[in-house]
Amino acid sequence: MDTPDKNRISAVSFCNFEDSPVFQYINDLSPIEPVKPGRPENILHSLVFTSPSSSSSLFCSPQLNSYRDSRFFIKRHRSLDLSSPVVLIGETLKNSPDALWEEKLKCRPEKLENVSEPKPFKEQISLAIELANSLKHGRDGCDIQMVSCDEVPMDADDEIGSGGGSRELSDELCRQSFDPLDFDADSDGVLHTDEMEAESGFGKEVIMFDVADIQNYEQQIPRTTDPRFYSLASEPQQFSIYCNNSNYVEEREGSCSVQVAAGAPDINLSCSSKVAAIDSTAEAEDKEDKDLQPSGKQRSVRRRCLTFDMGGSHKRIPLRDSTNDLPLDSTSINKAPSPQNCLDTSKQDTDEILPIPRTIGLHLNGFVNPSVSSGRKKKKIKDGQAFPSTTFHYNIEDEFSTPVSTKRDLVVFSDVKIMEPPERSVEGECFDQLMAMENRQLSQGLDELGSCKRCKCRKSQCLKLYCECFSAGLFCGEPCSCQNCFNKPIHEDLVMKSREVIKARNPLAFAPKVVSTSDTVIDLWVENSKTPASARHKRGCNCRKSGCSKKYCECFMMGVGCSSNCRCMGCKNTFGHTNEQCAGDSDVVTINDEAKHYGDHGDASRQNEEILTSERNRLLLPGSVAFRSLTSLSNLSEL
């Protein structure tokens, strides 16, 4: 038995497979053939897409329904009638989850039957390339005009879905709109003309596609030359603000036309045209200000101007504020001009400068005018004294409390006599007795008294003898840098008690270190190289570094030389040193000599009498306690 041929076996088996009834049944089934529809002329399915995600969703297999999974859909829009096919690009559907952009296309009715049929992949690519080339080279290949969606009301989508029940006004509509002279506004907020209505009557196709695909062609889209469509960016001087379902009034002057609807926010405008604002409150206020307006029109501008006195501007319009308006009476109209308004009269020749509202605004343009505020605070001088249109009030206290810049605004009448406040009288027997002496010697002793040291007490409360002010019989003043001080006029009782306690222990505690024994007043400021015979030392000085040549040395200040009782070091007193005692030294008596004299007699009463006599004789000398107390009283009177 031979081996069968392999080729023969395979051929026989293949023939048997084709002749099988199963294979014949499969062949008898009708094949699925792709439908090749005719190419439409005016239907745009897509542009040249650059993103792979969008191209994969659009150009899918011909056997599948591309419109089922695609993000394209068709809408009917009957509210907009245009004379030619227009593609509207640039607005986002609010209800779409993919945030797609909208394209509105006008086509013939006979061309819409093939919209839902899929097209081959190659034809879709060729159509997109042809459309891109036609748009790039400016050819009108598919009879399509590109218009931004900003120029069309965005309530079209809502009308399609809800049957025209809901209406929304887009913010983009306030930026660009049509000329109200060429177009009419219907109740739905759609702009159209009679010519456009005659040519209309066809449905519109709405196709959605991605934002990224549209932005690539925003600069390639040719701008229309139709005079009915124009952009605000191309003609910035010609614009209008259109608002849906609002009555508006328009005024034209030059090439500027502005419309402001009721309830719209205030807008700062820099153009020179007149602006009309429709507001019931504004019109009511304008009727009251009819006599004040330079023109006969009963309109005003409710806005905030940040530049009141800008050069080259036209007439200022008075800014109104219901809370800050002054009453329109003869007082406010015939008010006397303030010096601030009279400083520069050259500006009033060209521009009419109106008063700035008395409000404090955001840009510091409403500060209170000092001249006006100062006039309101003036008080009336005489009852019934009036002037033709207003009454000026004046108060003497305002003259002293008003700053220098506002004193010129005060009005002073010739019949008013301004009395100066009377001088304060100081009572006291000691002050009355020494008043004549003070006037003569005050000028001589001020320099010496002003040069004395001031206290710097910290813990003594300025009630001890080592406080310079307390020991000199003076109160602490401003030059002192003491802390917790009680040596002040308000604590006078406490100061006097402290002095009495110290005098009880040492009667000579507050006595000057140099006293005069003569009954006549001797000029001690005459330069003399010798110690006067009429002076005697009680304690002496304790100078260390000054050399007794400065005025805080007691001996040098009183014009006497230092004695043996002085404990100074390096004495250079020009009135006499310790070793330069002259013939007049016999007249100088030290405390030790007085102690010996009092000790010999042993009479304490005589000692007190002599001390009192010496105190009476030194009352008229500068630097004494009485003289210093007199100076302190004069200082208190000035306070």
Swiss-Prot record:
Enumerate composition-biased segments (Polar residues): 329-345
- Record's Pfam families? TCR (PF03638)
Q: Where in the cell is it found?
A: Nucleus
Q: Name one GO molecular function term.
A: metal ion binding
Name where it mostly resides.
nucleus
Annotated CRC domain residues: 451-576
The UniProt entry, under InterPro entries, shows: CRC, Tesmin/TSO1-like_CXC, TSO1-like
GO CC term, one of those recorded: nucleus
Which keywords has UniProt assigned to this entry? Developmental protein, Metal-binding, Nucleus, Zinc
Instruction: Return the annotated region ranges for Disordered.
Output: 282-301, 313-347
Q: Tell me which Gene Ontology terms the entry assigns under biological process.
A: regulation of DNA-templated transcription
Does Metal-binding count among this protein's keywords?
Answer: yes
Family (UniProt): Belongs to the lin-54 family.
Q: Tell what the record comments on domains.
A: The cysteine-rich domain CRC binds zinc in vitro.
What role does this protein play? Plays a role in development of both male and female reproductive tissues.
Q: Know the name of this protein?
A: Protein tesmin/TSO1-like CXC 4
- Which species is the source of this protein? Arabidopsis thaliana (Mouse-ear cress)
Q: What is the lineage of its organism?
A: Eukaryota, Viridiplantae, Streptophyta, Embryophyta, Tracheophyta
Q: Which gene encodes it?
A: TCX4
